[in-house]
Curated annotation (Swiss-Prot):
This is Proline--tRNA ligase. Homodimer. The lineage of its organism: Bacteria, Pseudomonadati, Pseudomonadota, Gammaproteobacteria, Lysobacterales. InterPro entries: aa-tRNA-synt_IIb (IPR002314), aa-tRNA-synth_II (IPR006195), aa-tRNA-synth_II/BPL/LPL (IPR045864), Anticodon-bd (IPR004154), Anticodon-bd_dom_sf (IPR036621), Pro-tRNA-ligase_IIa (IPR002316), Pro-tRNA-synth_IIa_bac-type (IPR004500), Pro-tRNA-Synthase_IIa_type1 (IPR023717). GO terms for biological process: prolyl-tRNA aminoacylation. It is found in: Cytoplasm. It comes from Xanthomonas campestris pv. campestris (strain B100). The gene is proS.
Length: 564
């Protein structure tokens, strides 16, 4: 590939709304160009990177035994009504009508189409298991598309759907896909973690996310120093707290006239924040609930929603708080409410003694509070908090927090979609059985941005070698003025290609400084310079993208550096 014949358009300036490094560098490198909000054209350069990611994903999916299909991007409302997702998916689902006023959606995911295809094609348990995958454009009508292709409305995704007769077989394929994903991200050269996760709108039981580790990641992850345990903070749990100590203080009322937060109360009383308890008032269809977490902890909304009877909870308003507690936010507590209420205590709160809570009186808190003496034991004890850095892990290690960008997700869906769409097969006894489903997604276009977030420096992108648009670019100095140098550079390019090395020739005739800056911006792993001086000495100037300086190598030394 000669860059004089390739559309390469780099820039020094980037739009002010490009917040993430990946967005800025992809625009500067000319990988993408904005068409409309959340919609991007991939340039020839960007497409080379995208196709390299796609190729590795396809190879590993085929290796894992999945078979490729292609579902329509436009799907009829009836399928989505059957699963209940036409309304449940919300505003992100782009709904359209054809000339006959029939309703369709531009799919953000394809569980419905996959289940319908399986219903049409699979009729016997002997055909199972089967795993269909596609690499297809998806669309989600984000309220605020941002961060370039990281959160675009249109994106390229690999989504796979497996079908099984039994839960055990579904679990085996889940493990098979998990192993395939580990191979994919390892081959791409990314630092990543597989973490336990919530199933979200997709639903199902077992669920794991794959995150590229990056400081700019939107997701907070917890991992243990004692094992390979890792989880999204949404689902991560710390070890069980130590048993509750005996009471050592008497109950006392203390004035806290302006102290409404646990931090302010702890400072006033000269106590550790861990001695205070935060009271969060919520309402459910069953009534008023007071949720208690330690003062230095935060409620985990996803965990709380999974507690029995809490799926539909919302924050209580001031009128509801006064009705049940006779007080106002900042001074709430579980001791002697106006009316009987349900109390949900986080596990750490349930094992506390001599703690501090609001007194349900404005400007007053209680100290020396103890379970069983000053208030009944909590009706419900559950893990309803976010873990924090340094928490004890259940494996004996410590939990550490980092940030990540989700690029893959695997689910065990069970029979949810197959049952809704009546996707059944005849089992060994000739009876109809609803198939079990697994679902496995990878955001291919998102991987490109995530890789840049993880791998860049002040000069530009630093691609992992498998993702780079070219492994090597041969830079020729003054190609139009020096035919001998141009010919030598062309010969070297042909030799590199013949050796199986993905290479390009920069024969655009730019000044050396501008040419080298482009190669650094583009993240080319290896740069080779052909010049008149080098030819006279029988050497080429070689520099790796991450090296501090260049070195002169003969041809044998050059090919050795390139791994050949």
């Amino acid at each position: 590939m000669r860059l004089s014949q390739f559309h390469l358009h780099t820039t020094k300036e980037t739009p002010a709304d490009a917040e993430l490094v990946s967005h800025r560098l992809m625009l500067r490198a000319g990988m993408i160009r904005k068409l409309a909000s959340g919609l991007y054209t991939w340039s020839p350069l960007g497409l080379r990177v995208l196709r390299k990611v796609e190729a590795i994903v396809r190879e590993e999916m085929n290796r894992a035994g999945a078979v490729e299909v292609l579902f329509p991007t436009i799907q009829p409302r009836e399928l989505w009504d059957a699963t209940g997702r036409w309304e449940k998916f919300g505003g992100q689902l782009l709904k359209i009508k054809d000339r006959k006023e029939q309703e369709f959606c531009y799919t953000p995911t394809a569980e419905e189409a996959a289940a319908e295809f399986a219903r049409q094609e699979i009729n016997s348990y002997k055909q199972l298991p089967l795993n269909f995958y596609q690499i297809q454009t998806k669309f989600r009508d984000e309220i605020r598309p941002r961060f370039g292709v990281m959160r675009a409305r249109e994106f390229l995704m690999k989504d796979a759907y497996s079908f099984h007769l039994t839960d055990a077989d579904m679990a085996r394929e889940y493990d098979n896909m998990r192993a395939a994903y580990i191979r994919i991200f390892t081959r791409l050269g990314l630092e990543f973690r597989a973490v336990q996760a919530d199933s979200g709108a997709i639903g199902g039981d077992a669920s794991q996310e794959f995150h590229v580790i990056a400081e700019s990641g939107e997701d907070s992850l917890a991992f243990s120093t004692g094992s390979d345990y890792a989880a999204n903070v949404e689902t991560a749990s710390a070890a069980l707290p130590a048993p509750r100590p005996a009471a050592g203080e008497t109950l006392q009322r203390v004035d806290t006239p302006t102290q409404k937060t646990c931090e302010d109360v702890a400072q006033l009383l000269g106590l550790p924040l861990q001695r205070t308890v935060k009271s969060i008032a919520v309402m459910t269809t069953a009534g008023f609930v007071l949720v208690l977490v330690r003062g230095d902890h935060a409620v985990n909304e996803i965990k709380l929603a999974k507690v029995a009877g809490m799926a539909d909870y919302r924050l209580a308003n001031e009128s509801e708080i006064r009705q049940h507690l006779g007080s106002e936010p900042g001074f709430l507590g579980p001791v002697q409410p106006v009316q009987p209420i349900r109390i949900i205590a986080d596990r750490d709160v349930a094992t506390m003694a001599d703690f501090v809570v609001g007194a349900n009186a404005v400007g007053v808190h209680l100290t020396g509070v103890n379970w069983g003496r000053d208030l009944p034991e909590p009706e419900t004890v559950a893990d309803v908090r976010n873990v924090v850095d340094g928490d004890r892990a259940s494996d004996g290690g410590e939990l550490r927090l980092t940030r990540g960008i989700e690029v893959g997700h695997v689910f065990q869906l069970g029979s949810k979609y197959a049952e809704a769409l009546q996707a059944t097969v005849l089992d060994e006894n000739g009876k109809a059985a609803v198939m079990k489903m697994g679902c496995y997604g990878i955001g291919i276009s998102r991987i490109v941005a995530a890789a840049i977030e993880q791998n860049h420096d002040d000069a530009g992108i630093v691609w992992p070698a498998p993702m780079a648009p070219w492994k090597v670019v041969v830079c020729v100095i003054n190609p139009k003025q020096d035919a001998q140098v141009a010919a030598a550079a062309g010969d070297l390019l042909e030799e590199l290609i013949a050796a199986g090395i993905d290479a390009a020739l920069d024969d655009r005739g730019l000044r050396p400084g501008a040419m080298f800056a482009d190669m650094e911006l583009l993240g080319i792993p290896h740069r080779v310079v052909v010049s008149e001086r080098g030819l006279a000495a029988g050497t080429f100037e070689y520099r790796a993208r991450t090296a501090e300086s260049a070195e002169n190598l003969d041809k044998a030394g050059l090919f050795s550096r390139l791994g050949h």
